[in-house]
Amino acid sequence: MTTSLAQQKIRIRLKAFDRRMLDLSCDKIIQTADTTAASAIGPIPLPTKRKIYCVLRSPHVDKDSREHFETRTHRRIIDIYSPSAKTIDALMKLDLPSGVDIEVKL
């Protein structure tokens, strides 16, 4: 039993360190889906992952003096329902920033 393209759902997962760049990418994807008459739901914000690194400030003995750095990974999900072939072509040709990681599932 095969499902036609009109009944499928495209799930797009986006990850980035910069929240503003991620939101701009989400807006571009939703705008592209709207221009090709596909319905888009999202962006749905997922929990932000924080990775904290502890580094000694001194190269020698002062272990009491430490510095903390963190990276935050912001994540979003966009679901596109009833995509057409035109929608998929437009999403493939979309120019997004290099700092945004994209995963697409059909």
Curated annotation (Swiss-Prot):
GO cellular component, one term: ribonucleoprotein complex
GO BP annotations listed: translation
The entry's keywords: Ribonucleoprotein, Ribosomal protein
UniProt entry tagged with the keyword Ribosomal protein: yes
GO MF entry, a single one: tRNA binding
Top-level taxon of origin: Bacteria
The keyword Transmembrane is assigned to this record: no
PANTHER family xrefs: 30S RIBOSOMAL PROTEIN S10 FAMILY MEMBER (PTHR11700)
Subunit structure as annotated in this protein's UniProt entry: Part of the 30S ribosomal subunit.
Family: Belongs to the universal ribosomal protein uS10 family.
Record-linked NCBIfam families: PRK00596.1, rpsJ_bact
Function description: Involved in the binding of tRNA to the ribosomes.
The protein's name in its UniProt record: Small ribosomal subunit protein uS10
